[in-house]
């Protein structure tokens, strides 16, 4: 009998074990789409980004005009740019939903997978930040100035570190050049880390909505979930193309249509929408170092989540108190996102401070208390 190439060829065997014959729980819901979506987003971003890099000039004198030239004179350059810019937003929508899913269903108990995932999120945030600087519009320039300046809050080495990062005494040509280099490199780092993420995931297998072991009832990934994923893929594609074709500038900042000018500060400096929650936490502390620490903690707190799990159940499916807290946390993040987009004045300052306090309180204090209470109520 001839050998089955798919199962025996060294390379195809890896693909087969990851995408075709992968044993998958039979009851995973649409919330498990998002890992696949993120992979699609990453591939799309790398392809569109590569096409953009072919026409982009990483120089302060030409960056803005090279982007304009791309949109006007390159075949479908406008479409490639719109897909790349809005693809980034979609990427963050997917990763936030993916993290939310992991939080709700207790997927974070696969500690290695979760920790690599948090590092992936940090790398993605760094990639998006340096990418936002490249068009060299007003918000690009001032966003870069404000965010890189935060490193100066580090005691003793801060100022030296910032000047080293800038390559001079302000954000200028060397900064733009190195940011382009980082923006080109980091997606490939993300690809490598994604493979590590998947390797750890396939060690334990996927979690499921009930949070119980599913070894006794698994089905092959293909054809069941490969077909199911196509529906999600179609919906995601419709969303991205609709956004890119009908309202490509909806999520951008109008200030970025003005070339960078170090002598004119925009009235309200703010990052892209997907960083606003962290930006609101940063602004809610009236001390520079304190704000920077809170900003870092807002994402790094995810590393603590597996350590704070005290419930005897893995998933929140049958834990009403934790569910209430979870959806309160979601609402709190939406409030933080909204506050981050508003000017620094009353009442937004106090709302931001209360929402920031609530964010850390829910994660670090209320979740463990609710879990312990549920254990007690259920006599577990």
From Swiss-Prot:
<dbReference type="InterPro" id="IPR048260">
    <property type="entry name" value="Cytochrome_b_C_euk/bac"/>
</dbReference>
<feature type="binding site" description="axial binding residue">
    <location>
        <position position="197"/>
    </location>
    <ligand>
        <name>heme b b566</name>
    </ligand>
</feature>
<comment type="subunit">
    <text>The cytochrome bc1 complex contains 11 subunits: 3 respiratory subunits (MT-CYB, CYC1 and UQCRFS1), 2 core proteins (UQCRC1 and UQCRC2) and 6 low-molecular weight proteins (UQCRH/QCR6, UQCRB/QCR7, UQCRQ/QCR8, UQCR10/QCR9, UQCR11/QCR10 and a cleavage product of UQCRFS1). This cytochrome bc1 complex then forms a dimer.</text>
</comment>
<dbReference type="InterPro" id="IPR005798">
    <property type="entry name" value="Cyt_b/b6_C"/>
</dbReference>
<keyword id="KW-0830">Ubiquinone</keyword>
<keyword id="KW-0408">Iron</keyword>
<protein>
    <recommendedName>
        <fullName>Cytochrome b</fullName>
    </recommendedName>
</protein>
<keyword id="KW-0812">Transmembrane</keyword>
<dbReference type="InterPro" id="IPR036150">
    <property type="entry name" value="Cyt_b/b6_C_sf"/>
</dbReference>
<feature type="transmembrane region" description="Helical">
    <location>
        <begin position="348"/>
        <end position="368"/>
    </location>
</feature>
<dbReference type="InterPro" id="IPR016174">
    <property type="entry name" value="Di-haem_cyt_TM"/>
</dbReference>
<comment type="similarity">
    <text>Belongs to the cytochrome b family.</text>
</comment>
<feature type="binding site" description="axial binding residue">
    <location>
        <position position="84"/>
    </location>
    <ligand>
        <name>heme b b562</name>
    </ligand>
</feature>
<dbReference type="Pfam" id="PF00032">
    <property type="entry name" value="Cytochrom_B_C"/>
</dbReference>
<dbReference type="GO" id="GO:0005743">
    <property type="term" value="C:mitochondrial inner membrane"/>
</dbReference>
<dbReference type="GO" id="GO:0008121">
    <property type="term" value="F:ubiquinol-cytochrome-c reductase activity"/>
</dbReference>
<dbReference type="InterPro" id="IPR005797">
    <property type="entry name" value="Cyt_b/b6_N"/>
</dbReference>
<dbReference type="GO" id="GO:0045275">
    <property type="term" value="C:respiratory chain complex III"/>
</dbReference>
<feature type="binding site">
    <location>
        <position position="202"/>
    </location>
    <ligand>
        <name>a ubiquinone</name>
    </ligand>
</feature>
<keyword id="KW-0472">Membrane</keyword>
<dbReference type="InterPro" id="IPR048259">
    <property type="entry name" value="Cytochrome_b_N_euk/bac"/>
</dbReference>
<keyword id="KW-1133">Transmembrane helix</keyword>
<keyword id="KW-0479">Metal-binding</keyword>
<feature type="binding site" description="axial binding residue">
    <location>
        <position position="183"/>
    </location>
    <ligand>
        <name>heme b b562</name>
    </ligand>
</feature>
<comment type="function">
    <text>Component of the ubiquinol-cytochrome c reductase complex (complex III or cytochrome b-c1 complex) that is part of the mitochondrial respiratory chain. The b-c1 complex mediates electron transfer from ubiquinol to cytochrome c. Contributes to the generation of a proton gradient across the mitochondrial membrane that is then used for ATP synthesis.</text>
</comment>
<keyword id="KW-0813">Transport</keyword>
<keyword id="KW-0349">Heme</keyword>
<dbReference type="Pfam" id="PF00033">
    <property type="entry name" value="Cytochrome_B"/>
</dbReference>
<feature type="transmembrane region" description="Helical">
    <location>
        <begin position="34"/>
        <end position="54"/>
    </location>
</feature>
<dbReference type="GO" id="GO:0006122">
    <property type="term" value="P:mitochondrial electron transport, ubiquinol to cytochrome c"/>
</dbReference>
<dbReference type="InterPro" id="IPR027387">
    <property type="entry name" value="Cytb/b6-like_sf"/>
</dbReference>
<feature type="transmembrane region" description="Helical">
    <location>
        <begin position="321"/>
        <end position="341"/>
    </location>
</feature>
<feature type="transmembrane region" description="Helical">
    <location>
        <begin position="227"/>
        <end position="247"/>
    </location>
</feature>
<keyword id="KW-0679">Respiratory chain</keyword>
<keyword id="KW-0999">Mitochondrion inner membrane</keyword>
<feature type="transmembrane region" description="Helical">
    <location>
        <begin position="78"/>
        <end position="99"/>
    </location>
</feature>
<feature type="transmembrane region" description="Helical">
    <location>
        <begin position="289"/>
        <end position="309"/>
    </location>
</feature>
<feature type="transmembrane region" description="Helical">
    <location>
        <begin position="179"/>
        <end position="199"/>
    </location>
</feature>
<dbReference type="GO" id="GO:0046872">
    <property type="term" value="F:metal ion binding"/>
</dbReference>
<keyword id="KW-0496">Mitochondrion</keyword>
<keyword id="KW-0249">Electron transport</keyword>
<dbReference type="InterPro" id="IPR030689">
    <property type="entry name" value="Cytochrome_b"/>
</dbReference>
